Amino acid sequence: MSDGTKTMTRDEMMTRVARWKDQKPNGQMFVDTRLPEYERDLYSIIGQGVSEDPDNPVAITDVEGFHMAYIGCEPGKGASLHSHPTVEVFIPVTGKWSIYWNEGEAGEEVILEPMDCVSVPPGVMRGFYNAGTEHALMIGIVGGTDATKVEWPAEILDRARATGLRLDADGNILEASAAE
């Protein structure tokens, strides 16, 4: 055996296997998901990621430099503009997806099809939506062992607040009744 390599038992490796049939979607992992155009199902596969839901279930909890989620939504639905302090990669599995970035008149967009890939740099405001005609799935990967939280435009936070959601000091979702 080479120096620096490990041997793992099957039981040890099975803690690092996520079966699609066992995954349960989280429809309120982010503050924007209560807004109709941003409804989506999120599946945290590897690592907690940047979830604003402290009770978010994760399939594989060992995190070694990245977090991965599956994203599913109906046509026209997706995620609001937001930013991360780390890189974010999007890979469509099914359907067509619009990945858009920058705010206002500086806005740009690219349409991705299955197995295309885009890597959005840290700090760039980005969003996405299903640009196809059927429910579609995409993989999202956020870099870093500690992916921190999302930065949202003030308009999105205000609209979410109007639905009864807000973020606490740690960046976790609170219902209005729990926040008061």
Stretches found by the model and what they are:
Residues 2-15, 127-180:
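Double-stranded beta-helix
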Residues 78-80, 98, 117-118, 122-127:
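Histidine-centered metal-chelating micro-motifs
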Residues 103-121:
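Short acidic-glycine-tyrosine-enriched beta hairpin
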